[in-house]
Amino acid sequence: MSGSYWTSMQRQKWQHTKPSLARERQRLWVMECQLFPQGLNIIVDSKPNSADSSNGNAANNGGGNGRSQLVATTKNIPITHRDLHYDKDYNLRIYCYFLIMKLGRRLNIRQYALATAHIYLSRFLLKASVREVNLYLLVTTCVYLACKVEECPQYIRTLVSEARSLWPEFIPPDPTKVTEFEFYLIEELQCYLIVHHPYKSMEQIVEALKEEPFKLTFTSDELQNCWSLINDSFINDVHLTYAPHIIAMACLFITVSIQGSNTKELSLTSAVTETLTSQSSLTPQQQTFFRFLAESHVDLEEVMDTIQQQIILYDHWDRYHEPWIKYLLHTLYLRPLSA
């Protein structure tokens, strides 16, 4: 346990470089290909071919309903496809984020605890595949353990009851299933449960900016935007690779860029690009923040990479398709054993 990120096990044991993270992901990829070479078979409704369609229409007209029938066919999703691979499937990443947030809001759990649950889930899914564990039970257990670590514990029966009300098909009524999974989770986390988050770093940076010579203050709306950006960043890998202050600085950079642009006409990508390229048209707030950024001696490459990952995330978010990922998980966990 450590009160400082710099001496914490989070930095010493769980902060990856990009190559080390890629090696962990490759190891999991190989394991998944060995354990689940058959991929996943799903049922897809499709329109019949022209010959079948004409026969079907004749039959339908005779029956008086006038409707063409859909044909159920089986489709195989190969194990090498990105679907259901946490590192490649942003649909799955965003869905996991919503699962944790949904359960947390039902129980009024503090954001710090939910952020810790996100980190636990990300670390666990470096070691295990969603194909071999119940994702909904994993989410419930991560929230349960995170609440204990962040000193806002939840009664396990209450937690399980709320989880069952959200996902009745996937959460067993027996609370001991969560406690059993908790031991499995702690083992995979190697008992390193203390997590340092960017929220505190953001508050420290904001306080530092209020002092001389910067005298820069943020409105409550700007701080809320930055807080929301940090929340969303847990979908990415940045919390596995960079220090909390790097993520906080990147989110403040995005906040300053957006506030200085016409957000009704510019996307996030355009706003950040405009800020980086149009030095002559920077607002006083942007100029002051960039001077602070330059004088703070943080790793600018890491800050820029975090910003880039956030932009990529929102690009994927625009194409997020929740019914598809829910259907895949439903098929994966609830299909007949003979399938």
From Swiss-Prot:
Biological process according to GO: cellular response to heat; meiotic cell cycle; negative regulation of transcription by RNA polymerase II; positive regulation of transcription by galactose; positive regulation of transcription by RNA polymerase II
Domain (Cyclin N-terminal): residue spans on this chain: 93-194
Region of interest called Disordered, as start-end residue ranges on this chain: 48-67
GO molecular function annotations of the record: cyclin-dependent protein serine/threonine kinase regulator activity; RNA polymerase II core promoter sequence-specific DNA binding
Subcellular location: Nucleus
Main localisation: nucleus
Gene Ontology annotations for the cellular component aspect, listed alphabetically: CKM complex; mediator complex
Keywords: Activator, Cyclin, Nucleus, Repressor, Transcription, Transcription regulation
Keyword Nucleus recorded: yes
TM region(s), chain numbering: none
Source organism, top-level taxon: Eukaryota
Ranges annotated as biased composition (Low complexity): 49-60
Pfam families reported for this sequence: Cyclin_N (PF00134)
Keyword Ligase appears in the UniProt entry: no
Similarity field: Belongs to the cyclin family. Cyclin C subfamily.
Subunit structure comment from the entry: Component of the SRB8-11 complex, a regulatory module of the Mediator complex.
PANTHER family in the cross-refs: CYCLIN
Protein name: RNA polymerase II holoenzyme cyclin-like subunit
Species assigned in the record: Candida glabrata (strain ATCC 2001 / BCRC 20586 / JCM 3761 / NBRC 0622 / NRRL Y-65 / CBS 138)
